[in-house]
Amino acid sequence: YIRKKHNVLIGERTAEQLKISIGCVYERTEEDKKIRPESVEIRGRSLVSGLPKTLTITADEMFEAFEEPAYSIVDAVKAVLEKTPPELVGDISEKGIVMTGGGSLVWGLDRLIACETGIHCEVADDTISCVAIGTGKSLDMLDILMDGSARNKYYKQ
């Protein structure tokens, strides 16, 4: 996005800094704007001159940059819900969706998913560690998981 819109090349660390500090995928309220910064100054290399260049990137620009990938995530959630057995969808609808992993920390993703699916969505406590802990538990029970998936008609589709 930064390269296309501003003709400036930035590194992964700078992109991560932008994502964490002002990245958002849902329209921010006035209250939200008081909590999070409106803009961040970054440095990169101009693709025109090859020289260092400083830019001020706004939260609105990040909203624009994240729009397409955010809706891809929403579409994936909807696709999973469409393939989920009805009784399980009922439970999910009642109890909500709990997001884990670093991507769940992108500001407003929980609100966007809730708005688009009509299902309450929240970010897990200690969301980064949840992924590692869950992966470890899954590996401990791999034989059970493989046996269950081999017999599950929904898994084979």
Task: For every predicted segment, state its role.
Residues H6-E12, R28, L81-V89, L145-S149:
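Active-site phosphate-binding and catalytic loops of NTP-dependent enzymes
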